Every structure is written in C-alpha cells, then in structure tokens.
Amino acid sequence: MIRELAGAKVFVCPEEGPSLADYANLTGLIGDLYGAGGVRLMAIPLARLGPDFLRLSSGVAGEVLQKLVNYRFQVAVLGDVSAAAAKSGPLRDFIRESNRGSSVWFMDDLAALEAKLAAAYGKA
C-alpha cells in the first residue's frame, strides 16, 4: 500500500506475503513499484526479509539492500533488531552506519520512520 509520510510517498509492504529475500519476489515488487509513479521509499517489515537477513555472513542483507539501492529506492527495514544487534558487533555497526546515511534505515515501526522523514525533510 502506498502512503504519504511527512510528505514522502512510501510503499509500505504488508506484514504477510512472500519473502522478499527471494530474487523473483523482490524483482517483481521492484517492477510493480516502477509503475507506481513517484514512490522512492520502501518500508519493509523485517519478517518479509527471511530468517537469514540479520545474519550478515549469509549475504542476504547485502543482496537485497544493494538491489533496492541500485534501483534508486530508499529502504526502511521495520522491526526490532535490538536482540540480533546485541549478539553481533558487525550487525550493530552496519545498522548504526546505515541509519546515519540516507539509503537504508532500520526503524522500529512506521511512527519512527515518519519521525525520521519529518526531521530529514523539515515536515511536522
């Protein structure tokens, strides 16, 4: 579903659905969004990215995020990553560095994403 958050058009992936860690599913979604006009930010629930997404050595996070960024999408991964980050220094560093940039963000929920967008774009 496409929503406007702090003036930005955001595609909010439903919680339920096929894994976006699957190449065909992710590519299909990218194709669909190219026809949606003006959507440049995807909010993806962590559950849709598969169990290996937060295990950096699996390569899933890199593959998924790089594909989306290559297609010029900003990505917000929605969900609690604190337990996984507490167990992995590299993951914690990756999340921290991602959140400092503008391409990939890890947010607890849509409200946190909206607050980040409002701060970034000066909209309340």
Language-model segment annotations:
Residues 2-124:
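Amphipathic, Lys/Arg-enriched alpha-helical "gate/interface" segment within cytosolic domains
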